[in-house]
Amino acid sequence: MNARGALGRYGEDLAARLLAEAGMAVIERNWRCRAGEIDIVARDGDALVFCEVKTRRSPGFEHPMAAVGPVKADRLRRLAEIWLDRHGGPPPGGVRIDLVGVLVPRRGAPVTEHARGVS
């Protein structure tokens, strides 16, 4: 795995831990199909959450939370629909798409930010 892949994996590990600490149950990670990948699928009570994780090393780059624009949001919605079609449809509590941004500074602890219902 290259450095970029390792950074992304580290960010996803932190995001999964953050979601679990918030009371969610992570049920799948890095789900792939021909249309793309969903980083994390989790259950939050009766709701199903599709979570995109964006990790950046330094604040000199675009903030991780700014990395999901309209095109990316549309793709996430399409991926969620495909996942639901393959797994029996939406749960009674509904579906939402969340974003976890992870900023890994050169020194100090990483900073995570969780935005619920971004799309």
Swiss-Prot record:
Organism from which the protein derives: Streptomyces griseus subsp. griseus (strain JCM 4626 / CBS 651.72 / NBRC 13350 / KCC S-0626 / ISP 5235)
Recorded family membership: Belongs to the UPF0102 family.
InterPro entries on file: Restrct_endonuc-II-like (IPR011335), tRNA_endonuc-like_dom_sf (IPR011856), UPF0102_YraN-like (IPR003509)
Protein name: UPF0102 protein SGR_1878
GO terms assigned for molecular function: nucleic acid binding
